[in-house]
Amino acid sequence: MTTESYTIKIRRPDDWHIHFRDGEMLRTVVPYTSHYFGRAIVMPNLLTPITEVVSAKAYRGRILAAIPEGDNFQPLMTCYLTDTTESSQIEIGYKEGIFTACKLYPANATTNSSHGVSDIKNIYPLLAVMEKLGMPLLVHGEVTASHIDIFDREARFIEQVMEPLRNQFPALKVVFEHITTKEAAQYVLEGNNNLAATLTPQHLMFNRNHMLVGGIRPHLYCLPVLKRNVHQEALRAAVASGCDRFFLGTDSAPHAQQKKESSCGCAGVFNAPSALPAYATVFEEMNALPHFEAFCSLNGPKFYGLPVNEGFIELTRKPSTVIEHIDCNNEKLIPFLAGEDARWDVKVTD
């Protein structure tokens, strides 16, 4: 691994999994994505979830209003699936270009998921509609039964939910989001072209020791939680393999500092300001930079059936200090790698 300065140029990337929140938080964080990314799949888990076309249109409007002048960015909206979601909302939203995909949250799996699906069979009729439309299903892949250890929830999800689901709907396009385990990585590698996965920078850079040894680091706490080193290494090997069904999804999820640094802290890593340097660092460490552009900019559009972005960004191998905090509504947001020297500096070239 060299420390010499050099520059790589890639197609403008996309973020296939992000949380913008709403209100002042949305207005604060959107520019950190819109400046560098061409598109982003926007998660629908607001306090009042995005379950209908009308609410998706309104939310998209609020996002568009937060994009700084000059940024060429398109938010791609998703529908939050519930036990009572109407298939007409999915079909109309997809055909009108409002919904790009639907999101499956097992009930109570993560932030604002209490409205999620209680039993996957409850939405089988919806999945049949999606399969017919060619509409992707985005999956938070964890079971939530109280007796299952939090570190085992993803692996158990594959056995109990994902495999039966894919057997029932073999033509359904499925994104296994923010995978964290060797079991998930292997499952996707062995899958067909209808199965893909996103990976976050924190799960590629760190494991649970980084979060827990020598003191708890709450700004590394997210769901699914960081796992053992063996799982981290499996994720790194997966992206380094060049498999075109792995792509960038930051799962950037901002919370105010006081909500992270508390006796019962919120799950979520706000990584939008530092995600691209972090990903580049991992690919460099894995001697996989030849696959970096595909992971960031090509694999996602291929899976979703969308054109690649026309613009470009440049990443230069030189230190660039990550901002320590971002002010938001009289509170602070602490970004991923806050105050640290990232190895890469990023700029837009078009």
UniProtKB/Swiss-Prot annotation:
Enzyme Commission number, as recorded: 3.5.2.3
Cofactor: Zn(2+)
Pathway note: Pyrimidine metabolism; UMP biosynthesis via de novo pathway; (S)-dihydroorotate from bicarbonate: step 3/3
Lineage, broadest ranks: Bacteria, Pseudomonadati, Pseudomonadota, Gammaproteobacteria, Enterobacterales
SUBUNIT field: Homodimer.
Name recorded for this polypeptide: Dihydroorotase
GO cellular component: cytosol
Catalytic site: 251
PANTHER family: DIHYDROOROTASE
GO BP term, example: 'de novo' UMP biosynthetic process
Species annotation: Photorhabdus laumondii subsp. laumondii (strain DSM 15139 / CIP 105565 / TT01) (Photorhabdus luminescens subsp. laumondii)
Catalytic activity annotation: (S)-dihydroorotate + H2O = N-carbamoyl-L-aspartate + H(+)
Entry binding sites for Zn(2+) 1: 17, 19, 103, 251
Family under the similarity heading: Belongs to the metallo-dependent hydrolases superfamily. DHOase family. Class II DHOase subfamily.
NCBIfam families: pyrC_dimer (TIGR00856)
Residues at which Zn(2+) 2 binds: 103, 140, 178
EC primary class: hydrolase
N6-carboxylysine PTM sites in chain numbering: 103
